[in-house]
Amino acid sequence: GCQPCSITTGFAGAGAFSDGKLSLSPDVGGTLPEILGYEKAEELIHEADDIYLKFGADKKVYGIEDYEAIEAIRTKAIRANLKLIECPIRHLGTEEGYKIYTRLQEHLIKSGVEIKFMTMVKNILVEDGVAKGVLTEQGEAFYAPEIVAGIGREGSEWFSHICKEHGIDTKNGTVDVGVRVEVRDEIMKELNEKLYEAKLVYYTPTFDDKVRVFCTNPSGEVATEYYDDGLAVVNGHAYK
């Protein structure tokens, strides 16, 4: 295959060709609320959402209308020992997401932002314990007041090596082991229409392990993705 892979790298990364769901709540996702605080994380989520809307995202948000129906779903979940986490969802769609990112990329270029593709970063330039820039495999050095390493899953091994080389402390995050389960539309219809993606959590009785529903794709299809380190993962797609 291609190296680097144009499906999992490039502008917007794997997100450009994914289902494109925006979870508009700090209660789900990563550790941003722990780092910046809940209110600041919520503020940044809304700021990012506004950018998506500016470049053409669907205005419809799931999970905020028909309160009585959502409460009925919550009651059913409780009876099944499940916890329903409230989370508004905006769905971009597999066939629309990359168009939004294309408009965003074109806007950045028109605004004078230089984007370098097919340019491998060899190292981070550190001076007096502070990241000052990056060095490419072509020997070019780029300096900036702030360096953001948006490496995703594809660049995790590279970034781990960089951290070890520069003595940067790291800690392992939670690793979720997931499976894709296909069911008929009729079974999921109520959840899909009211919530689009039902955030359901279950704790196992023996070891209290957390099990959660993640990345559902209503009326969609399962697809495999392969990363450069040989890792095969299962993704899903859903169209508008």
Where are the language model's segments positioned?
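Residue-level recognition of phosphate/Mg2+-coordinating polar/acidic sites
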Residues: 47-60, 75, 80-84
